[in-house]
Amino acid sequence: MTLSFVTRWRDELPGTYTALSPTPLNNARLIWHNTELANTLSIPSSLFKNDAGVWGGETLLPGMSPLAQVYSGHQFGVWAGQLGDGRGILLGEQRLADGTTMDWHLKGAGLTPYSRMGDGRAVLRSTIRESLASEAMHYLGIPTTRALSIVTSDSPVYRETVEPGAMLMRVAPSHLRFGHFEHFYYRREPEKVRQLADFAIRHYWSHLEDDEDKYRLWFSDVVARTASLIAQWQTVGFAHGVMNTDNMSLLGLTLDYGPFGFLDDYEPGFICNHSDHQGRYSFDNQPAVALWNLQRLAQTLSPFVAVDALNEALDSYQQVLLTHYGQRMRQKLGFMTEQKEDNALLNELFSLMARERSDYTRTFRMLSLTEQYSAASPLRDEFIDRAAFDDWFARYRVRLQQDEVTDSERQQLMQSVNPALVLRNWLAQRAIEAAEKGDMTELHRLHEALRNPFSDRDDDYVSRPPDWGKRLEVSCSS
């Protein structure tokens, strides 16, 4: 089957990119590809028989027209000026059978005009982390970019140490970022900002294209998508680590996996990025940062969208966030209805977990085994303050009884939203260390496990992290 590629970005948004081709690595070789995603995209298996080929930037497929996009952004709350695709190249936009498109973005593809002081490369460590994280999030049901392939090489790349250069093929419906809009707003080119908005509406919000109020309705949906995404991050214990405006997806996708982390111990102020000295991107600050980023996006639209309309959309953020978060957390607790005491029960559980540094994922998974008329719980042994747990658990079981559903019905719901497996940093690190020694077994094994996060397991994938696993530090180079 011949794949079809279109060139919408190149044709419709002149002045927003530089056309250039990838720079291949030395002795590139394919070490992993996403069979399930490839099937979804109707990619012939024969394409993966070439060790590098398009996956290593050595060849292009017919219809591809590679380019690097320019954008700007606020980093850690400070205007950083021009950024752009410093090590990634958009190879092409695949046209799927249903008429939608999928970007093929090659990360680690070499120097671009936007590389600044960088080398344009990615390392094996970071490409493995992103591939694992994006697929883990996808199977958790959270909107995200996807990983299609990883290529490693003999090219040395200099970070904290010398590491093997690698490339990741990332796919997504769009790589439109808040930073694209900021770039042209701060260059005082409001017509370019409007062109970006029109492009987004035409291709991703086409039902609004003929509406006279299209910009307000579109921005309101961007706000809602962002609020929903952040709510989902918070419920699974995901910390992004570097929520700069250039890392914010217009479509509400999780984008740019760097120093991310899933909670081990429940620590509301968890900081996963060791470069985040002030804790701006701590776990509990993510909802506020997302709103701040939306405010920066709204500012770029102010030349052609009424400020009152923008503020009205921004004002809806908190309610959308709380609605999505509340619905998901009630499911995690097994509540079939909404009752006035629900928030108090959840907050008391969080307080208990924070005091005892309870494992976030394991706590909710074990809570899924609760029988409403039994005081026995395997979760009790996870707490030192048994009296405090017993008091909370007794009131929790009374609350469960109000819903008048069977234990099996409720347990089935809870186990469908409380994962047994999340991508803990130590699991990724173990796969990385093996891969750097040439053994890809654990990389493939972990990828396969992450496809079924809600299934019970009896291996160390669902155990508490070892002591060394809790001390892992990750930075933006991750």
From Swiss-Prot:
EC number, UniProt record: 2.7.7.-, 2.7.7.108
Pfam family, one: SelO
Active site: D246 (proton acceptor)
Sequence positions that bind ATP: G84, G86, R87, K107, D119, G120, R170, R177, D256
InterPro entries: adnlytase_SelO, SelO
Gene: ydiU
Binding residue positions for Mg(2+): N247, D256
Similarity comment: Belongs to the SELO family.
Catalysed reactions, semicolon-separated: L-seryl-[protein] + ATP = 3-O-(5'-adenylyl)-L-seryl-[protein] + diphosphate; L-threonyl-[protein] + ATP = 3-O-(5'-adenylyl)-L-threonyl-[protein] + diphosphate; L-tyrosyl-[protein] + ATP = O-(5'-adenylyl)-L-tyrosyl-[protein] + diphosphate; L-histidyl-[protein] + UTP = N(tele)-(5'-uridylyl)-L-histidyl-[protein] + diphosphate
Protein name (record): Protein nucleotidyltransferase YdiU
Xref: HAMAP family: YdiU_SelO
Keyword Manganese on entry: yes
